[in-house]
Amino acid sequence: MLVITRKKGESFLIGDDIEITVVKLDDGSVKLAIDAPKKLTILRKELYNEVQEENKKATNFNPSILKNIKSK
């Protein structure tokens, strides 16, 4: 893991086309601006983890519940 120290207004690059800028510093939080291509999906980690968990739940299908469905 790379740890980078930046001050307000300073940036760092990831590759050639992603720039992260420190916009605001508060007690216990940092506001970042991310300049990246539109095709790139950017998610907060907790949101990504939540989506992954919901996807796992969606794949837990019990086929025995279909026995209760009447066909015409």
Curated annotation (Swiss-Prot):
Main location: cytoplasm
GO cellular component terms, semicolon-separated: cytosol
Sample GO molecular function, one term: mRNA 5'-UTR binding
Pfam families given in the database record: CsrA
SUPFAM superfamilies named among the record's database cross-references: CsrA-like
Localization in the cell: Cytoplasm
GO biological process: bacterial-type flagellum organization; mRNA catabolic process; negative regulation of translational initiation; regulation of bacterial-type flagellum assembly; regulation of carbohydrate metabolic process
InterPro entries: CsrA, CsrA_sf
Record key words, sorted: Bacterial flagellum biogenesis, Cytoplasm, Repressor, RNA-binding, Translation regulation
Subunit-level organization: Homodimer; the beta-strands of each monomer intercalate to form a hydrophobic core, while the alpha-helices form wings that extend away from the core.
Summary of the function given for this chain in its UniProt record: A translational regulator that binds mRNA to regulate translation initiation and/or mRNA stability. Usually binds in the 5'-UTR at or near the Shine-Dalgarno sequence preventing ribosome-binding, thus repressing translation. Its main target seems to be the major flagellin gene, while its function is anatagonized by FliW.
Protein family according to the UniProt entry: Belongs to the CsrA/RsmA family.
UniProt name for this protein: Translational regulator CsrA
Source species: Clostridium botulinum (strain Loch Maree / Type A3)
